[in-house]
Amino acid sequence: HAIGIDVSAFNALIGNCKVMKYGLVDVQTEISRITKALKEFLANSHTLEFEEKLLQALYDFNNKYFPVPDYKYKRKQGEINEDEYGTEKEKDFLPIFNKLVKEYNIKLRQDKTDTFLDKWYSQNIRDEIQLVFAEIKKIKNIATKKIISIILSRTIRSCRATTHADLATLVEPITATYYCSKHGKICKPLFSILKWWGTYTKDTLARLYQFDKLRTQTFQFCLTGDSRTIDIFGEIEKRNLLFAELAQRQKIKGIFSSPPYVGLIDYHEQHAYAYDLYGFERKDELEIGPLYKGQGRESKQSYIQGISEVLNNCKKYLVDDYDIFLVANDKYNMYPIIAENAGMQIVKQYKRPVLNRTEKDKGAYSETIFHMREVSNG
């Protein structure tokens, strides 16, 4: 059994969709219907034809000027100045790109940049997103509608107009071909969601089928709320009486969480596209240690207080001999203070390397798993 708490409504939706029960035939049927509508929409535009021509032009150009493995070897040996050479070749390819854009009448930018969806998506992609979203609205089954909404959100997260090197930390929207330091060649932004939509529909269905076979007869639910003040059992009672009775009788064995670290991430902003599209209410002001507040002395104090309040609130719902595991790269050494504030002691620390990072920065990075327990009076 598990209870999650998240201040972000969208994150709670993701969590709940992972464990929800579905009519998988209905999910497959609706995916097929929407994919057909998307392909029909694309057949009436020149987007795919444009992309095909562009990919061929890029293939020829990159083979000539960024041959594998010669280019990467020369770059490593310092025989090529990557910044100068990359910028020069980026400029050389631009006329080819612009000619194709004109030929196929591709609209690179939207008319306004008011919202995240306006700014970070080309007009073609925005039109496709709106089409799929309109089709999702027609779905009758609520569970099916939710999981396909998540598939669309995964798709649009992968289709933002950014360079491959800046996927994790958006810098400026990209509307043309560019030299890509991550791949060592000229790359392009996306002009259609079709590829990623296809990837994520297949991936999600495979995960749902697999999880259905592994599922146990247990309860899981992710609540939307502020962990510092939420009445966990009261909120569960509103949604599932059986689960609430079980939780109140047995209490909670422990916590496993990876809280955002101070000044590292704006939690709601990382999913701004979903808040724009689905209209969820944002609660940015309730975030603990957001990026926009920085890492100054006041921010650290506020973070320590916030995490301490979470632990003190949640303790009320735990068994006496609880175990808490918190994951953090605690470079400011705040967790010993947090543990003390919550009447806990750190009984063990586990070091964990962080692999498979999205960004170009692949530097060594490790986190600590803090194992905390109630301070013993003996």
Roles of regions detected by a PLM:
Residues 1-43, 182-231, 254-283, 321, ...:
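Conserved S-adenosyl-L-methionine
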Residues 147, 321-323:
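Short glycine-centered segments of the SAM/dcSAM-binding site in methyltransferase folds
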Residues 230-255, 260-320:
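SAM-dependent methyltransferase catalytic-core segment centered on the flexible catalytic loop
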Residues 13-121, 128, 132-135, 280-293:
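Conserved phosphoryl-transfer catalytic core
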Residues 116-120, 297-303, 324-330:
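Acceptor-substrate binding/catalytic loop of class I
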Residues 1, 15, 148, 315, ...:
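S-adenosyl-L-methionine
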Residues 329-378:
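Class I S-adenosyl-L-methionine
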Residues 94-255, 262:
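SAM-dependent nucleic-acid methyltransferase catalytic core
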